[in-house]
C-alpha cells in the first residue's frame, strides 16, 4: 500500500510542477507575443454600418411609396430624420412640416 501512495504523490507533484512550469514559461513569453488582431472587430463594425445603410434605404423607399400612394404624381418631400430631434437645415428642397405645425 505504501508504494501506491508514493506513486500518487509523485504524479501529483509532477502535475503541479508541470503546471507551474507551463505558466511560468508563458508569463516570460507574454511581452514578446504579437498583439491580437482587430479583424473580428472591424468585420463587425463594417457589417453593422452596411446593415444601417440598407435599413435607411429600405425605410426611405417605403416612405416614398406611401407618399406616392396618397399623392400620386407629386414630388416626394424630404424625409425628416427619425433619430435626430435637433435643428436641421435643408439647402436644396423643402423640409417636411412637423405634425404639430401642420394641424
From Swiss-Prot:
InterPro entries per UniProt: At4g29660-like
Transmembrane regions: 38-58
An example Gene Ontology CC term for this record: membrane
Keywords, comma-separated and alphabetical: Membrane, Transmembrane, Transmembrane helix
Membrane topology: Single-pass membrane protein
Domain of life: Eukaryota
Disulfide bond positions: none
Protein's name in the database: Uncharacterized protein At4g29660
Gene behind this protein: EMB2752
UniProt entry tagged with the keyword Transmembrane: yes
PANTHER family per UniProt: OS05G0540200 PROTEIN
Locations listed in the record: Membrane
